[in-house]
Each structure stands twice: as C-alpha cells, then as structure tokens.
Amino acid sequence: MGLSDGEWQLVLNAWGKVETDVAGHGQEVLIRLFTGHPETLEKFDKFKHLKTEAEMKASEDLKKHGNTVLTALGGILKKKGHHEAEVKHLAESHANKHKIPVKYLEFISDAIIHVLHDKHPSDFGADAQAAMSKALELFRNEMAAQYKVLGFHG
C-alpha cells in the first residue's frame, strides 16, 4: 500500500505548511485529540489535569509535546516510506513505555487531517487529504506490525 511519487509530493507539500509553526500545529492536533477522545488524555500524566480547551491552549507543556510529536512524524513522512528504523524506535517507546494503543494512532491521524484542513483549506484539498490519510495509514500499519513483534496488543 505504498504511495506514488505524486502522493508523497502532496504529503510533503502539506507538511511544509506544518513546518511554518510545528509547535502551534502540534498543540492544535493534541487539543483536537484530547477534546474529541477524552480517554486518550489518561495516557498523559503530564496533561491529565487539563480539563478545558482553554487550559490546553494555555499549556506550554502541551505545546512542547505537540512540537515533539509532529517533529517526529515529519521526520518519518520525509523518508517517504523508508522509515523502518524511526518506526521501530517509536513503536518501542509507544508500546513499552507509553502503552499507546493503535486505536489512539488512528485518532491522532484523524486530528492531523482535520487540523491541516481547518488551517490550510486552500492547500489541503481532497487529493492532499487522501494522500496524507494514506501516508498516516501506512505509518499506523507499520507501528501495529512492530507492536506485534514486541508482544504489545494495544
């Protein structure tokens, strides 16, 4: 289920918009994740106390973590499918330390698509959305495969 060169170009063009403000985009993605799926907040001891969207927007720690998440994802996307080492490392930490279920990766993928569309509607049309969805699905499938190797059934 690889992406074509054209699809990767759409993904990287969209990601270029993210890179104009990685922390801001990351914060919005996490806010959308936590407000849309409050159960995900339970995996983050550092953020459990944030109960409202206003509290989340005011949290510098949430913004920093959003930057970390999207910086890691951007590094993976830029590898255009050749990211085995990065995914293996990420899967190990997310399975063994953080215990993040694959379902939560689906939730954050949806949040990424929505934030990109909300912030950049003219640059993130149907073709770009489809390509990004495909790239994120590829990433999730590889994370799930690594989880299986690690014996994590999240």
Curated annotation (Swiss-Prot):
The modification Phosphoserine is found at residue 4. It is found in: Cytoplasm, Sarcoplasm. InterPro entries: Globin, Globin-like_sf, Myoglobin. GO terms for molecular function: heme binding; metal ion binding; nitrite reductase activity; oxygen binding; oxygen carrier activity; peroxidase activity. Keywords: Cytoplasm, Heme, Iron, Metal-binding, Muscle protein, Oxidoreductase, Oxygen transport, Phosphoprotein, Transport. O2 binds at residue 65. The modification Phosphothreonine is found at residue 68. It catalyses: Fe(III)-heme b-[protein] + nitric oxide + H2O = Fe(II)-heme b-[protein] + nitrite + 2 H(+); H2O2 + AH2 = A + 2 H2O. PROSITE patterns: GLOBIN (PS01033). GO terms for cellular component: extracellular exosome; sarcoplasm. GO terms for biological process: oxygen transport; removal of superoxide radicals. Nitrite binds at residue 65. Residues 2-148 form the Globin domain. Its main location: cytoplasm. Its EC number is 1.7.-.-, 1.11.1.-. Heme b binds at residue 94. Belongs to the globin family. Monomeric heme protein which primary function is to store oxygen and facilitate its diffusion within muscle tissues. Reversibly binds oxygen through a pentacoordinated heme iron and enables its timely and efficient release as needed during periods of heightened demand. Depending on the oxidative conditions of tissues and cells, and in addition to its ability to bind oxygen, it also has a nitrite reductase activity whereby it regulates the production of bioactive nitric oxide. Monomeric. This is Myoglobin. It comes from Bubalus bubalis. The lineage of its organism: Eukaryota, Metazoa, Chordata, Craniata, Vertebrata.
